[in-house]
Amino acid sequence: YSYTTIHRPEHSIDSLVSEAVIGKFPYYKTGFHIYNLPTNTPTEWGWNPENLCDGNLETGWHTGEGSGGKLPHQMTFELDRPTELHTFKIYQRAQDDWAFRAGNPKKYTLWGTNSLPAEDGSDEGWTMLGEFQSVKPSGLPVGTLTDADIAYARAGESYDIPEVGVFRYLRIKVLESWGGEQAVHFMELEFFGIPHEETGINDSNI
């Protein structure tokens, strides 16, 4: 949004118009849960996909090279309410020396739809909202980390969504892992935008 102010000094015949001030409405963190489909990649090691939306950075989702098959691996979600999505954040596995290696996502796509997802889990009716890539601040080879790399990973990687729209269902597809493994692990996802229902908004989620 943008706005200007107009002021007419006393005894003046002209009004003074300020330069336009440009701002953004606040984005809210939307709740979500797993939407079960047969094409959701199976879990291994007891790292269930529900961990991606529990607010706990010590738990996460882990697929396997065996049950999951080759990449891409994917998971489907239902938002608590239709939301005009603008940004999202992904927290990779960054405890100890895990950041930017092994099954942490390196390249991935995000998809959205408002239609009830097909029971066969196909992409019919879905819109790709963007392609995203994790970037290691130091640029050093896999297995070598700086303090800045670790801090960046633990803070979560934020992305603007290029195809802004109102969606109820989301799907993430991991195309490539940092370690080149055919398995995926990360800890948490967060989605931010503008709710499109007239229900109350929980300000604690800002």
Tell where the protein language model's regions lie, with residue ranges:
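Tryptophan-centered motif/residue detector
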Residues: 25-33, 61-62, 126
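Amphipathic alpha-helical interaction segments
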Residues: 35-36, 53-55, 134, 140
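Activation corresponds to long, low-complexity, non-globular regions
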Residues: 1-27
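Short amphipathic beta-strand/extended segments with alternating polar/hydrophobic composition
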Residues: 3-5, 127-133, 206
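N-terminal short leaders/motifs
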Residues: 18-31, 139-145
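Flexible, small-residue-rich N-terminal segments that precede or flank a structured functional core
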Residues: 28-46
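Extracellular carbohydrate recognition and processing domains
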Residues: 124-160
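Aromatic, loop-rich ligand-recognition surfaces of beta-strand-rich domains
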Residues: 7-16, 44-123, 155-205
